[in-house]
Amino acid sequence: MIIDAAKGIDNLHPMISGVLVIADYVIQQRLNVEPHLTFGNSGAHAAGSLHYKNRAVDIDWPPWNERPQDIDVIAAKLRLYLGRDFDVVAENTHLHIEHDPK
């Protein structure tokens, strides 16, 4: 996974750190491209976002919207692998993944 330190990976919750490894594997296995961490705890997010609590990341890959069916398959696989304490949401430009224990 391509990670720019300016994207806010310092102090990520340990559960989110593990997400990066799993997402990297799932995306590379499906698409054979290296995913990008677009945001960790940096950037502007909605009020109350789990990004600010170090419990969310945004991930994309090039080209993001070329094959929408891949986005759905990858999101579904991540939901399966990560379990019910994680939310995986396909946004317009990225996957949003957060640790939100139920």
Enumerate the language-model features and the residues they cover.
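Active-site acidic/histidine clusters and adjacent loop/turn architecture
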Residues: M1-L31
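Catalytic cores and adjacent binding grooves of peptidoglycan-active enzymes
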Residues: A6-L12, H36, N41-V57, W61-K102
